[in-house]
Amino acid sequence: MKKIFLPFAAVALLLSSCKDAAPKEELVINLQEKGAEVAPSMYGIFFEEINHAGDGGLYAELVKNRSFEELEMPEGYYAEGDVLHPKKVCNHISGEVREGSFRWTTEPVPGWTLSTKDAAEMKLTKEQPKFSTAPNNLKVTIKNASTPVRLINEGYWGMNLVKDNSYQLRTIIRPASDYKGKVTALLLSEQGEVLASAPVDITAAGQWNDLSLAMQPTATSAKGKLALEFDAPGTVYVDYVSLFPEKTFHDRPNGLRKDVAEILEGLHPAFVRWPGGCVVEGISLENRFEWKKSLGDPAARSGEYSTWGKSEA
């Protein structure tokens, strides 16, 4: 009898202790009673360049890696395959030294491809940069132009090109003395059909030509492309290629995507917190966000590899 009683006593004691460990507490919300006033100025929105919230998102730029700076990294960083290793960081409070790693692209020129691998080649160079703050440019060597060679950019998962809408192209280009051909800008469908074509009128060989022109596609393509076409052998250097829809938020050049920005405007925020949180401090002090570098000519801006594992223009 004693052996049977002991287990029951233990269970009863356990249940009793559990009951005491969970006191009855409740939260009562009275929807009929008004609480403290919250100033309208306390309601705002937060923006940080995470997961292409800016490049490929709110920012209306259609070209990915427009200034060929995406492979630049701060001093002391290095890449192994698809991993970026930043310099070691010492915590300013604990003194702990941390090693981190971030994703890195293995594309030789992020965002850009050639229509042929045999008749032409491309590589990044810093020869005679247009801007010291954004020194990289693309050297395109055309070996055989029996079929014109195209330098292609698909943007961020394709460019949304709308029939009869106007798009503003700006390119900074320098043909070497051995290039005697023409350069043509093309808007292409996902299948490669030409939706718009415009000559890029180069006036000075061996010098940087900063050129702007408007283009209108004859059909809509949700995953369109931009191409620069070369029809002769020789070498051409490309420093900058930008394509914006003319219809941006409030029709501002170098502006925001109209559809996304209007949704944000409709929230009637009292303020915008920018540039965010972790982006401000950076992975290390060398790549912290410096807002003064985001001013001036977009072609002269260096961009930065951010805390969130991507380069931002």
Task: Describe each region flagged by the PLM.
Residues 1-24:
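Bacterial Sec-dependent N-terminal signal peptides
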Residues 18-312:
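Extracellular and organelle-lumenal recognition/adhesion modules and their flexible linkers in secreted
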